[in-house]
Amino acid sequence: MEKFRIDFKKENGPKYIQLYKHIKNLIENSKIEASEKLPPLREMSAFLNINISTSVKAYDLLEKEKYIYKKEGSGSYIYPQASASKEVLKAVRFDLANPQANMFPVDKFKEAVAIAIEKEGETLFDYHEGLGYEPLRMSLCDYMKSLSIESEPDRIQIISGAQQGINIIVNSILNYGDVVFIEEPSYPGAIDVFKEHGVKVVGIPVLDDGIDIGILKLKLEKIKPSIIYTMPNYQNPTGVCYSEKKKKEILNLAKQFDFMIIEDDYMSDFDFNNTKIKPLRAYDEENRVIYIKSFSKILMPGLRIGFMEMPIHVRNIISRIKYSMDISTSSFTQLSLYYYMTFFGWRNHLDIIKKVYESRFKIAKKYIDSNFSDILTFRKASGGVNFFAALPKDYSSIDLKIFLESKGVKILEGPLFYYNIKAENEFRISIAHMQENEIENNLNTLKNGIIEFLSDEKNKMKYKIPN
């Protein structure tokens, strides 16, 4: 107990903050072991001669910031990753969906930057028009033809990443209390944007060939959404691809029930089964789709650049909202990307990335199909970098996450991907951030950890899920 002793000083703020900081410091400096139990609240309060409510506030703050977790009826324990920051670097990172740095075209992009500086001079660091640098928008129109999308520069808005695009649309088109339909499970970044803006969110289940059209129709007959948010190709987190029939059905429903569609696309460039897939936007003849394209999986996520392709009737409001957020996406980044796409084999880079992702996906899928069927249920991913799995119903992915982190394996828990329900037994793994020759060994490590977790009856639903 002696390590918890504090010399409370009035000038250091409220006592609960001082206690919180003291315990946090002990954790970060490995003075408390991973999964170690903290003293009970009454014992801590008596030892420090403070009110029990002070200890409660300190523990609650530690839990909120994920330094501790609570076992119902047992007490408070240190999160494994909280005291193991150095070990995280060595962890098996199934939680990361971004590409590894060795896949970035750094040398060629560096040359593109040099050309941009030489050709543009000081204008490289000035603002460009609100929609974005026009030659880049023209190049993007040419690029979209490879995705079977015909467009024009006036329909392109350069954005600082896909999440900003969603944010712009919500601020442009939606009012407080409007209804948005989303896939469930769905992309956490989009869920966060909808939560922040106070819109009403209705979840529609995702099946093996895309969103559940039957349930979607039932919901549409009772509720009028302004927008449906969807990832039709290699959906995050399931890896599911919508069938062509389902894409056309959604567009017909959009016309019938008069709603817009946000299509969030980050992997339509790739065909994982030698089948050329098209974005939903490629089938849109009624100007219902606002198409968001992120380069996070196909270029370098740190560039924070993407684009929206939009119907003309929403262009002005979207451009105004974009301007109010950051005036324009970095001119330096826009022009550097333009010169990279123009002079440095952009299409060749896409072909290389496609082969890498396709090979990794096939290795992972083969291993999963052969080795996990007796312990987990996986969604039928068509491609991409993610796999979505379910534990038996009486086990929580929060519990599994905590258990695996103590073994050096990191996953993402299912509740992150839901708005309206708590999918406690589901979780996502990604093979994006690992080498091809690591995948089978890493999956084997994951499998052994899950088998060990499931073999202990005490692991059945007992941890309190942190807020």
Segment roles from a protein language model:
Residues M1-A116, E120, F125, L136, ...:
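N-terminal basic, amphipathic alpha-helical segments
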Residues G73, E152-P153, K380-V385:
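Short Gly/Ser/Thr- and Asp/Glu-enriched loop/turn motifs at secondary-structure junctions
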Residues T123-F257, S268-F270, T275-Y283, Y357, ...:
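Conserved core of the PLP fold type I
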Residues V289-S370, T377-A381:
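PLP-dependent aminotransferase class I/II
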